[in-house]
């Protein structure tokens, strides 16, 4: 059997994942406005795909061409382009379908040719007052380097000014940094009709108001376009440059990087298209994609609901964790027993409140945290600044190389440093992706450490839409090893042994192999053996080979993979014992969890790391055992609920068909809703045991 049959290219698997996102937009059981927002999510994902995955393959082609290598990457690029074009065609079909569905509910997304006289007058006034001050045409001439001025991933209108047989060209940036993309057009009182127009179409309607009096023309035409640049950048690892300076320079490289995709309105004249491709230095390896009138569909993630409540998902108020209740402070609660939070079902407020309390608690002497992505106006980060003002020793490890969050992290680094926080940037070339918080208190018996080990970021906003686990513990063995991780970050060459935590790149590969080998050995000895894995991405060939070996030995393997999956299930004699599902729903599945049967004494681990070579060998990641039996069972229960999903689970197979899982039972189980109900009952039971009153749902 060829190696290709054992391994699905991660880029094609990623496109298959985005197809699952598109399935949500097609699902008529999903509320209408949410379906439109899934189109925005699909588009945002595809933008990132071209900036990262597509760019990487293109780079490999150019390197192979210089070195005289083979054309495997060319073949892959061709397959990627073909699949992406098919998905775009399906996207266009769904968009038109959803526009019709909205109209049936008296919501109209109109263009500039569909306005009545009263609406036209309102649009002209709105344009003159709100839009025109933000519009400055960029006139295209042979002397101007357009690439120097065009912004990555911004929507533009390419304007053709025709006079007889001559044509001038200009570019207009759609100013969504200053104005909303979707504008409600006032209707007569009493009308049920709701009319929305895109900012793009307001500009199209008023093109004459921009150019009249400055240029002579007989005809004026506008066409949508967007360019995607390569997102990679090179860092100069030189002694005289700090990492902060290197990152700032790297981001400047990204601003002027060559394009990898050019999307244009399919009605654009051929001469205009050729001229723009010439000015943008579009090569035959890049994706040239004809599209509709609108680009930057990622803005549709924030599409407004101007209709009835039923057009959106029913709210699921975040649950208050009862384990914190009845204590004077969060530290007393954590010292009593380990606490597991599962977002967004639980409120992230518990973490911001923990850090707030630590910022002024007289017993707290130090706080250490590592930051990968945080909210723009993060209360948690502001509490760290408050802690310094209150005399606490605060150390923040900021990952400057968090893709697409680099600028925000640079800005936070400056604010923290100015406030007196000890800011560390880690090791150049090795991202720090662990999710750790360590608070040290001086108590009666001496110093006591409280640790947070998580699967997701300390980000107040994404914690409302990403599912993740946070383990809070006063287990001094685990807390000491969390302290050891911070020491390792500050001095990666210092020998540190981890007995409980599994830490990349120190021991993750060897420890994961050890855990999988033990299940293989148990199966070969005739014992029951099983592996349950949940990750975002599974593409590491070494770990995939080990999973194949486990399946061949008779180990039962069940996996939940949200995104890329290069393992091929269902291969005779190789992966017959492997079942893989993927769940796409209202929340983005993000935890990394491993459960091994361990001869009847299950071990449960939560982790920040996906099963990718970069996460196992080239990043600082932390995987922690769950030692509290109560929490272990809770995580196992949550995974079990997901494997019973009959609504949102798709089966991952070698054909990447994305078929929904059919389980033969009539009862519909939507796992995310079932998990919410399960955790709600857990909190209710905990309060009952404590003799406490259940909080009102409105305050949860």
From Swiss-Prot:
Chain positions recorded as Mg(2+) binding sites: 373, 403
Name of the molecule in the record: Polyphosphate kinase
UniProt keyword ATP-binding, yes or no: yes
Keyword Iron-sulfur set for record: no
Residue ranges constituting the PLD phosphodiesterase domain according to the UniProt record: 428-462, 585-615
Xref: SUPFAM superfamilies: Phospholipase D/nuclease, PHP14-like, PPK N-terminal domain-like
Family: Belongs to the polyphosphate kinase 1 (PPK1) family.
Binding site for ATP: 45, 466, 562, 590
Source species, domain of life: Bacteria
Cellular compartments per GO CC: polyphosphate kinase complex
A single GO BP: polyphosphate biosynthetic process
Top EC category: transferase
Cofactor: Mg(2+)
Catalytic reactions of this protein: [phosphate](n) + ATP = [phosphate](n+1) + ADP
Signal peptide range in chain numbering: none
Keyword terms, alphabetized: ATP-binding, Kinase, Magnesium, Metal-binding, Nucleotide-binding, Phosphoprotein, Repeat, Transferase
Post-translational modification summary for this protein: An intermediate of this reaction is the autophosphorylated ppk in which a phosphate is covalently linked to a histidine residue through a N-P bond.
Single GO MF descriptor: ATP binding
Function: Catalyzes the reversible transfer of the terminal phosphate of ATP to form a long-chain polyphosphate (polyP).
Active-site residues (renumbered): 433 (phosphohistidine intermediate)
EC number from the UniProt entry: 2.7.4.1
